[in-house]
C-alpha cells in the first residue's frame, strides 16, 4: 500500500486530482493508493460482477459496478465491487448512469489482495455500513473465506 503524505488535501482538492492506476482513495485526510489487483482477485471480481448483474439487472432491481469511486461521509473510496439498488443509481440528464456517485452503495464487496491490510479494508466496509450500506463482504481468497457484515448485526463467516 502506497501512501502519499506530502501535504494535507481536502476531499474537494483530492477529487480534482487526476485518477491513478491503481486507484487512490481519500481516507482520514490521507491519500492511499490501492494495491494492483493480482490473479485470484481479478478472477473473483471478473466472475462476480456479471453473476450479480445477470440476476438483478434484467429486473431493474439493482446493478453491480466494478472499481467504482464512491464519495460520501468525508471519504472517497473505490471498492472492488459495489451494488446499487436500481432507484438509487445516480443518473445524468439523459437518464444514463452518472459518472459521479456521491452515496454509499447498498452492498459493498472487497476482495483482499496479498499486499492489502485486512484492517484497512474492514474499516472501509464499516464506514459504508455507518452511511447506509446494507451489506458488506470481505472476501479472503487465500483463506477461501467470506466475512459478511450487516448494520447492527454480528459478523458472519463463511468458509469454502
Regions found by a protein language model. Give the residues of each.
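Gly/Pro/Ser/Thr-rich low-complexity, intrinsically disordered segments predominantly at protein N-termini
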Residues: 1-160
Amino acid at each position: 500500500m502506497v501512501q502519499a503524505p506530502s501535504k494535507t488535501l481536502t476531499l474537494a482538492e483530492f477529487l480534482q486530482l487526476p485518477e491513478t492506476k491503481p486507484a487512490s482513495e481519500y481516507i482520514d485526510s490521507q491519500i492511499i493508493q490501492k494495491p494492483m489487483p493480482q490473479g485470484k482477485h481479478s478472477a473473483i471480481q471478473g466472475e462476480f460482477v456479471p453473476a450479480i448483474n445477470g440476476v438483478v439487472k434484467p429486473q431493474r432491481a439493482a446493478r453491480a459496478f466494478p472499481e467504482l469511486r464512491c464519495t460520501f461521509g468525508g471519504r472517497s473510496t473505490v471498492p472492488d465491487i459495489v451494488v446499487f439498488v436500481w432507484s438509487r443509481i445516480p443518473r445524468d440528464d439523459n437518464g444514463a448512469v452518472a459518472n459521479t456517485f456521491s452515496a454509499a452503495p447498498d452492498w459493498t464487496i472487497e476482495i483482499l489482495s496479498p499486499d492489502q491490510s485486512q484492517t484497512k479494508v474492514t474499516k472501509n466496509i464499516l464506514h459504508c455500513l455507518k452511511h447506509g450500506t446494507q451489506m458488506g463482504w470481505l472476501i479472503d481468497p487465500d483463506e477461501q473465506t467470506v466475512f459478511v457484515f450487516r448494520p447492527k448485526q454480528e459478523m458472519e463467516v463463511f468458509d469454502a
